[in-house]
Structures are given as structure tokens and as C-alpha cells.
């Protein structure tokens, strides 16, 4: 069993520079991550299951549509090898608060399963998968203090 923190994301500044044809905002921003966040506890299981607990659990529709499970399925589809998992997501980040909670959860799951995998993904494959899950997932995967541009795909450590 492992427990991993999915830290909340704080935008130090955010400038919207335009919009793409598919509706994404073009950004110039700097972000940092807090010590506060959601917690994912992961342990081997026969079948995949996700339990959502915590103060803000009721703000999520259901476990089946959660980005954590989408990330897990995407990891396997990308060639990562991992057995069945029981995942408990403790929601400490308010849902819809602009703190990147869902993206942080998906990124934390990817970090954890890649470490546990008997056939982990290389960094490029992991970041491509993260980008396919959402614009904030790659920066949440990178962590630290980042200057981001585009729709979030261009990151420079600060």
C-alpha cells in the first residue's frame, strides 16, 4: 500500500492571451504547488475500484467518471503494466475551486502507477498521456514552480 499527495495548484499570475479553434485558452502563467492536497491510497486488488472519501467527496458525481480511473485506464492503454488496484481518493481540495484538484489527482495516480509498474512508461509517453487527460495534468505531473504557456503544454521550471 502506498499513499501519495496530489497537491493543490496555485496560479501566481494568469494572463489569457487568446483562444484556440477548439476552445482552449492560450495562457501565460506561473504556478506553484502547495503542501496541501488530496491523498490517494493505492493497494493491490483483484479488480479496479475507487472509493472517494473526505470533506469534498460529495462534490464529485461518481467514481466511474473520475479522472483518476481515466488516467489508470489510459496508463494501461499506453502500454503500462499494472495489476488490479483499490484506490481511495481523499478529497481535501474543494471541487471546482480552480486549484487543479482533478488534474492533480490524475497526475498523482500516473506517478504512483508508473513507479509500481512492471513495465513503466518513459517520460515522453507519460507526459503525452497526461496531456491527453487535460491541459493542467502535465504541469501537475511536473510539479514544482513552472512558467506555462500555450494551453499549458509549454513548461519552463522557474
PLM feature spans:
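Generic structural signal for isolated residues within well-ordered alpha-helices
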Residues: 74, 112, 128-132
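ATP-binding N-lobe of GHMP and related small-molecule kinases
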Residues: 1-97, 115-119, 124
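Short, small-residue alpha-helix embedded
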Residues: 103-116
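Acidic (Asp/Glu-rich) catalytic motifs at the cytosolic membrane interface
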Residues: 97-103
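Alpha/beta catalytic cores of group-transfer enzymes, especially the acyltransferase/condensing modules
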Residues: 120-158
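Acidic active-site catalytic centers that drive phospho-/nucleotidyl reactions
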Residues: 9, 105, 136
